[in-house]
Amino acid sequence: VDPGESTFIDEGATGR
């Protein structure tokens, strides 16, 4: 899992 994916899972799209 790259940083964008983990933020997507955690915050709902913030890292995308």
UniProtKB/Swiss-Prot annotation:
Gene Ontology cellular-component annotations: extracellular region
Modification after translation: Conversion of fibrinogen to fibrin is triggered by thrombin, which cleaves fibrinopeptides A and B from alpha and beta chains, and thus exposes the N-terminal polymerization sites responsible for the formation of the soft clot. The soft clot is converted into the hard clot by factor XIIIA which catalyzes the epsilon-(gamma-glutamyl)lysine cross-linking between gamma chains (stronger) and between alpha chains (weaker) of different monomers. Forms F13A-mediated cross-links between a glutamine and the epsilon-amino group of a lysine residue, forming fibronectin-fibrinogen heteropolymers.
Gene behind this protein: FGA
| Keywords linked to the UniProt accession | Adaptive immunity, Blood coagulation, Coiled coil, Disulfide bond, Hemostasis, Immunity, Innate immunity, Secreted
According to the UniProt entry, the note on domains is: A long coiled coil structure formed by 3 polypeptide chains connects the central nodule to the C-terminal domains (distal nodules). The long C-terminal ends of the alpha chains fold back, contributing a fourth strand to the coiled coil structure.
The name this protein carries in UniProt is Fibrinogen alpha chain
Entry annotated with the keyword Translocase = no
Q: Which organism is it from?
A: Oryctolagus cuniculus
**Cysteines joined through disulfide linkages:** none
